[in-house]
Amino acid sequence: MNNMNKVIIIGGGLAGSEAAWQAANRGCQVELVDMKPEKYSPAHSSPLLGELVCSNSLRSNDPTSAVGLMKREMRFFNSLIMDVADSTAVPAGKALAVDRDKFAEAITARLESHPNISISHREVTAVPEPADHPTIIATGPLTAEDFAESLAELTGRDRLAFYDAIAPILDSESLNMDIVYCKSRYDDGPGDYLNCPMNREEYERFISELASADYMPLKDFEDAKYFEGCLPVEVICSRGVDTLRFGPMKPVGLPDPRTGQDPYAVVQLRMENAEGSTYNMVGFQTKMTYPEQKRIFRMIPGMENVEFVRLGSIHRNTFICAPELLADTLQIKKRPDLLLAGQLSGVEGYIESAAMGLLAGINAARRAMGEELVSPPAEMALGAMVGHLTKSAAKNFQPSNVNFGLFPAWEKKVPKRFRGEKRAEASALALEVWNEKWQISEQV
């Protein structure tokens, strides 16, 4: 393969497969490198490309949901993943689920038969040296140790994580502001935190439920070695009834305006976006099952009817600190010949990983062809996801799936029942204008 219009992609999961398809369809000569079957991660067992490791569900197909919007945008750009998913779908109500074996078989067959794609099965142990052609890194959440070590040398060790620790994010409009109050500890700051106060009885009942909750079991390839600075709330709880009250739920310096006194305990909520439409629960990363999170966290005063934008989780996941390292084109800022895609870039979920592969493939092709690289508008699901990667606060960055909390705030209040529809309309318009300007969907 000569360097003319050459693109190399490392990793044959959903992101790498989609990236290869997009770049090849734009006339690039693509080398897709995957270490299977020479070497397998602890979670993989099939030699096929596009292997689904956990669930076979690709979530909602509803075009007024955030992930449904992302799927619609991907289909517009002739997504391999979406096309194969649609053709291998199994009955799943309003969700899109696939026959995982047929899904991986079809992806592999489509890529192997593409005239512009060559596939190599070998392990890449180091980040490639700077080159004239673009390289997409899509090695996934279980990136092999040697490659992760090399990537850490490039990014800085403090900018590469090996576990994500995600606390729930909630819709601020669903909070009971008759109970919840704004205040920074000891008034040290402008009062950016929201506080949910508890008396002793409420706290002890909450702790009791937390201690007996149902939890997601660890996968075979995960272990329970957590960082002390980012412990699951249930692990802290197991160390004693008052441990949380002297940790994330410390009430000192946060007097309740209704009483003028410090509460017995407090749950703090930190603003997740500049508009204040979503907040995260400070220190509440958890492995509780989703139903248990909803049940137990709605016991918190002021959160009785709370609506969650994202629920908490903790699992093995290699990912970079995207806000410090990535441009909105998915290029590594200090190495513009390198693009990142998939969960390694800081997204969560099959569709989100494939979507970042789609964008990386488009931009790698544009770079190889000498064209200007593009970034989707924030009104699109693709753009909202890129915004999370590049505009979040670096200090607290954690992976996320696509959700409406990542989209721009409404200029005027929109009734809740119409929000999905309005997001879909705005996304469709933004997509049309963006594509018309840059001619992104043009295929060779």
From Swiss-Prot:
* Reaction(s) catalysed (UniProt annotation): uridine(54) in tRNA + (6R)-5,10-methylene-5,6,7,8-tetrahydrofolate + NADH + H(+) = 5-methyluridine(54) in tRNA + (6S)-5,6,7,8-tetrahydrofolate + NAD(+); uridine(54) in tRNA + (6R)-5,10-methylene-5,6,7,8-tetrahydrofolate + NADPH + H(+) = 5-methyluridine(54) in tRNA + (6S)-5,6,7,8-tetrahydrofolate + NADP(+)
Q: What class of enzyme is it?
A: transferase
Task: Please list the residues that bind FAD.
Answer: 11-16
Question: Which residues constitute the signal peptide according to the record?
Answer: none
Q: A Pfam family name for this chain?
A: GIDA
Q: Which UniProt keywords apply?
A: Cytoplasm, FAD, Flavoprotein, Methyltransferase, NAD, NADP, Transferase, tRNA processing
Against InterPro entries, the record matches this protein to:
FAD/NAD-bd_sf, MnmG-rel, MnmG_N, TrmFO
| Protein's GO biological process | tRNA methylation; tRNA wobble uridine modification
Any single GO molecular-function term of the entry would be: tRNA (uracil(54)-C5)-methyltransferase activity, 5,10-methylenetetrahydrofolate-dependent
Q: Which cofactor does it need?
A: FAD
Lineage: superkingdom: Bacteria
Q: Where in the cell is it found?
A: Cytoplasm
Q: Name one GO cellular component term.
A: cytosol
Enzyme Commission designation: 2.1.1.74
Q: What is its main location?
A: cytoplasm
Which family is this protein grouped under? Belongs to the MnmG family. TrmFO subfamily.
Q: What does the UniProt function comment say about this protein?
A: Catalyzes the folate-dependent formation of 5-methyl-uridine at position 54 (M-5-U54) in all tRNAs.
| Protein name per the record | Methylenetetrahydrofolate--tRNA-(uracil-5-)-methyltransferase TrmFO
Q: What is the scientific name of the source organism?
A: Desulfotalea psychrophila (strain LSv54 / DSM 12343)
Protein's gene: trmFO
